[in-house]
Amino acid sequence: MSFTPRTARHTPFERRTTLMANTVIGSSIVIDGEISGDEDLVIQGTVKGKISLKESLYVEGSGVVEADIETQNVEIAGRVTGNIVASDKVELKTDCRVVGDIKAPRILIADGASFKGNVDMDMKER
């Protein structure tokens, strides 16, 4: 029996977000705690706790987040368990899984995305 290593195949979303972000949490990294910052963040690994960013968060297909999220924009292709508050937009990509409430003025849910929770798009708080 021979072993042939498989190379990682990244979707166009994953290639684009990895190139755009200043900070990437790799697929073998696990963080338990609070993350805060002023720049974009890509999560390919696992984050538990709380995430607070002034810019955008990208959760790639391999990413697992068990945290409340507060940021400007969120794009999710992986799994998120926790409440999401975005000042601009939340986008759930095909095959993502999200469990928690979403509060944002704009929300996009792709065909094939899984979402369980409540949505609040209250325009008064913009």
Swiss-Prot record:
It is found in: Cytoplasm, Cytoskeleton. One of its GO terms (cellular component) is cytoskeleton. Keywords: Chromosome partition, Cytoplasm, Cytoskeleton. GO terms for biological process: chromosome segregation. InterPro entries: BacA/B. Disruption phenotype: BacP, ParA and ParB-parS are less organized forming smaller, more dispersed patches, PadC still forms foci which are mislocalized. In a triple bacN-bacO-bacP deletion ParA, ParB-parS and PadC are also mislocalized, nucleoids are more compact, DNA origin regions are mislocalized, DNA content increases. The triple bacNOP deletion is synthetically lethal with smc or double scpAB deletions. The keyword Acyltransferase does not apply. Interacts with BacN and probably also BacP, the 3 proteins colocalize as an extended structure. Interacts with PadC. Belongs to the bactofilin family. A non-essential component of the chromosome segregation machinery. Positions the ParA-ParB-parS chromosome segregation machinery within the cell; BacP seems to be the most important bactofilin in this process. Forms a heteropolymeric, subpolar scaffold in the cell; BacP probably forms the core, BacO contributes to position and integrity while BacN does not seem to contribute to assembly. This is Bactofilin BacO. The gene is bacO.
